[in-house]
Every structure is written in C-alpha cells, then in structure tokens.
C-alpha cells in the first residue's frame, strides 16, 4: 500500500507496510496560511498502533545491529539521494503545513539531506578506545553498542531537520526507530519516511505512528520495549516524557524551550546587529527554540539601535509562505496564534510599551490564516512575563542597560539557557561573555538562531536534559559504552 490513499489520507508505516490505525479515525492537517487548504489527513493512532510499531522495531533490532556501521550508512546515503530528488516536494509540503517561507523550507530540507550524509559517514568512524591497563599482559578497551529501540518525538517547527537529526544517528549507530511527529506536520514526516522505505531499509527498522501526544508520545515514553526516548518540544510536555522514561529506567533526551538573549554593546556594528536581531527574531515567525527573544542594549546606543529595528520591521512583508515576495508567513496554528497574542496583551498590561506591530491580521488576504504583525516592546524590565517566558512568536523585548555586566546578569536571569549572542568588537567582552553566559550555544557577532549540523546542539538549565544532539555528540546518547578487559 502507498503512503497515501486516494482520499489524500496518509498512513502509518509499521513493519515495512503503510497501514491504517486501529481506530479508523483521522486528523485533518491544514495550511496555516489558508485553513481552507487541507494538506492531508493523518492517522489518529491508538495504544494498539504503538504496540504494533514497538513490536516490529524490537523484532528488527537484532538483524539491524549485526550490520556494520558502513552497511547501515549506505541506507542513509540512499535515503539522502532520494530526498534530494524530492526536495521541492518535501519543502513545499513543509511550508504548507508549518507556515515558514519556501526558501526557509528548502534550506531546511537541504540541511536534512546533509545530516543524512554526515551520519552515513559516521558509520565508518571508530566506536571505542584502547585504554592502558595496570596489567601488562592484558588488553583493555571500550566499544559502543546500540541501545535497541529508540522512540523519537519530534516538533512541528522544524518538520524535516529535527526528525532527521534524531533518526539518522539512531539508525547508523544500530538502533531501530519508532517516530511520532507533531500532528501539525505529520504529512511532511510521512514523505520523509517514504524516502527511507524506497532506500530499502529492512522491515521494522523505521516505523511511523501519527496521533495525539497523550496517546502515542506518552505510549512510547512508558513502553518497556522502548530503550530510549528523544524529545523536542515544550517544557511542560518534556517533563512528562522524561518522568515516564525515568520511572522505568529508560534513557531519555529532552530539548525544550529557550528565552534567548542578544546583547548589543556600545562598540557593536549596529547595522549587522540589527539585521541579525530581526532575522533571529522574526524568521519562521519567531517559532524557533533558538529565536531571539530578548535584546539587551547599552544605553548609549539604545535609541539609534531601536530606530534601526523599527525601520527594518516596517519593511517586512507578511503573507502566504509559498509566495516569492513574502518574508514572514503565518503562525503555525490557531493555538499558537492565541498564545502569542496573549503574551502581547500581557506585555502591555505589565507596562511595556508596544512600539510596533502585535496586531492580529484577519482582513483581506489574511482572513483565512493565522497571521500576526511582528512586535517590538520597549521599556521592558527583566521581571516582566515577556522577558521571562518563551513566547514562540515574532516578539522582541527591548531592555536598556548601562553596562555589559548588567547585560550579562539580565541575560542569565531566566530559567532557560539554550542560545545567546553578543555583538561587540572588544575581545575582552567576547571572552567574558563566553565564560559567564549560561547557554549551551554561544554566538559572537551572529544571530542567536544559527546551528550547524556537525556541532553539538543543546542547552543549559531548563532548556535541556543536559545531553547534546548532532555532531559526534549524538553518539553519546544513541549508544552505550562497554568496557572490555581481555586477559590472554
């Protein structure tokens, strides 16, 4: 059976077959730019579907782990080649589902392909170290082994890159996978899984189950047949997933929220800083865990910098993300839009000054979508809600400070610690920032939202469970170490 039926319905993929869920029910996936555009219908899966997928993954894991890393890597190379042929199709689907602009979606899809090829190559790298023994006649070394079955719970904001940067290392290091994507972008995930299928992965090695997090995601976290769970999403849900995995002794990895600061020092290149702030805050309509949220500016340049941000914001074109002249698309869903608008209202209630934007767009070409104007707040203090909580929308909180020391204190004055950036020409300030900022990603003269696939990704404090994704660091989560002592 194909990934899609004639009714534009997308199926689960379990044990090498495209199948309907046990419930027989489906969930509508709509385009946030125009809710009358139905991207497709996906399965509203049940606990029985989770059971079938986990069983298939367990049955496949022994044969899969017995392949060499190089052999497993070949499947990733083939998948990457197939995805490359379908880049336009996958990117357009991601845009229709999530709302990011088509150039952004194409870039993300290209990145997903690059991630596959990167981890395909990792299958040829060493899996252990030789360690000197105190016994001169003995050999001691480490080797890495797969965990078994990995449950992947992926978010809607990066529907291509994040599922792949979880699945690719899991697979190449010898694990089998059951993925539960966010329902909002489940069609894109189905198209990606179809590429793995065409690449010839053995039945049961990769499985797709769509449906509600409370059933499918929670089911994976609680299932004794799932050896590890990797999750990206909200702090609220992440804590539930982590507690469920911990309760049964399973390995878990959580990547969650951020409240990412950019410090603009009085010696900064203001043009470069303004462009980076606008891009970091408003690209993908602010729906990135690494998006710029707080902009902390020294008082001597505050007014000049504020004007640059306002002018750049006025030039932003908002609309259907598939159109070439659009710079910022819609919010991904009604719930997300309502959440963003509630934070904007909260900012005004607490005394911040809304300088620009922040209005829901609902007339004319916007009437069928989830649109909001990008917003910039002035007169923000660190204790305000909009300076403390993740909004996940196009909202900047401007904070004025007198010194870099004050800026650093405010930057660290949140429960999150994912990404942080500073703009300065002073090497001393750069080094102090690197040393003192509480963030897993530290950016100097660059926007907060930049990530490279070959480097570790993850946060501090409540942004993460303190493991790292991507690059060689992924090996630490997706494998277990055996220490071997050999006495002839």
From Swiss-Prot:
Disruption phenotype: No effect on vanillin degradation. It catalyses: 2,5-dioxopentanoate + NADP(+) + H2O = 2-oxoglutarate + NADPH + 2 H(+); 2,5-dioxopentanoate + NAD(+) + H2O = 2-oxoglutarate + NADH + 2 H(+). It is an enzyme of class 1 (oxidoreductase). One of its GO terms (molecular function) is 2,5-dioxovalerate dehydrogenase (NADP+) activity. Its EC number is 1.2.1.26. CDD domains: ALDH_KGSADH-YcbD. The active site is at residues 255, 289. Pfam families: Aldedh. The keyword Lipid metabolism does not apply. It comes from the Bacteria. NAD(+) binds at residues 180, 233-238, 336, 390. Keywords: NAD, NADP, Oxidoreductase. NCBIfam families: AlphKGSA_gudD (NF042993). Homotetramer. PANTHER family: ALDEHYDE DEHYDROGENASE-RELATED (PTHR11699). Catalyzes the NAD(P)(+)-dependent oxidation of alpha-ketoglutaric semialdehyde (alphaKGSA) to alpha-ketoglutarate. Prefers NADP(+) to NAD(+) as a cosubstrate. In vitro, can also use various aldehydes. Belongs to the aldehyde dehydrogenase family. This is Alpha-ketoglutaric semialdehyde dehydrogenase.
């Amino acid at each position: 059976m194909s990934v899609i039926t004639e009714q534009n319905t997308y199926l689960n993929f379990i044990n090498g077959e495209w199948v309907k869920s046990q419930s027989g029910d489906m969930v509508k996936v709509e385009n946030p730019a125009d809710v009358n555009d139905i991207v497709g219908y996906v399965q509203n899966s049940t606990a029985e579907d989770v059971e079938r997928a986990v069983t298939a993954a367990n049955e496949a894991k022994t044969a899969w782990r017995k392949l060499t890393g190089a052999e497993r890597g070949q499947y990733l190379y083939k998948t990457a080649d197939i995805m490359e042929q379908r880049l336009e199709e996958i990117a357009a689907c991601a845009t229709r589902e999530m709302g990011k602009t088509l150039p952004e979606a194409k870039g993300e899809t290209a990145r997903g392909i690059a991630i596959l090829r990167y981890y395909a190559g990792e299958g040829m790298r060493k899996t252990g170290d030789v360690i000197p023994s105190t016994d001169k006649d003995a050999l001691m070394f480490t080797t890495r082994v797969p965990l078994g079955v990995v449950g992947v719970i992926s978010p809607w904001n990066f529907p291509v890159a994040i599922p792949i940067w979880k699945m690719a290392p899991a697979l190449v290091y010898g694990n089998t996978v059951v993925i539960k994507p966010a329902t909002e972008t489940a069609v894109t995930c189905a198209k990606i899984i179809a590429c793995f299928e065409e690449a010839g992965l053995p039945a049961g090695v990769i499985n797709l189950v769509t449906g509600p997090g409370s059933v499918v995601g929670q089911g994976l976290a609680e299932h004794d047949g799932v050896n590890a769970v990797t999750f990206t999403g909200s702090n609220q849900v992440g804590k539930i997933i982590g507690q469920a995995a911990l309760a049964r002794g399973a390995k878990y990895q959580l990547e969650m929220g951020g409240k990412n600061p950019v410090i603009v020092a009085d010696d900064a290149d203001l043009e470069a800083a303004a462009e980076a702030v606008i891009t970091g805050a408003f690209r993908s309509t602010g729906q990135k865990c690494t998006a710029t949220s707080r902009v902390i500016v020294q008082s001597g340049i505050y007014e000049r910098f504020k004007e640059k941000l306002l002018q750049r914001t006025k030039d932003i074109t908002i609309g259907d993300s598939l159109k070439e002249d659009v710079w910022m698309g819609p919010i991904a869903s009604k719930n997300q839009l309502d959440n963003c608008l509630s934070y904007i209202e909260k900012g005004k209630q607490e005394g911040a000054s809304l300088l620009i934007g922040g209005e829901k767009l609902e007339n004319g070409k916007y009437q069928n979508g989830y649109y909001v104007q990008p917003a910039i707040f002035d007169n923000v203090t660190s204790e305000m809600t909009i300076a403390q909580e993740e909004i996940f929308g196009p909202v900047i909180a401007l904070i004025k400070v007198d010194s870099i020391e004050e800026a650093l204190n405010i930057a660290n004055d949140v429960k999150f610690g994912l990404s942080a950036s500073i703009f300065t020409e002073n090497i001393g300030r750069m080094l102090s920032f690197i040393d003192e900022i509480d963030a897993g990603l530290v950016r100097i003269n660059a926007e907060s939202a930049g990530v490279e696939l070959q480097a570790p990704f993850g946060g501090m404090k409540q942004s993460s469970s303190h493991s790292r994704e991507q690059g060689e660091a992924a090996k630490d989560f997706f494998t277990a170490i055996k220490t071997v002592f050999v006495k002839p």
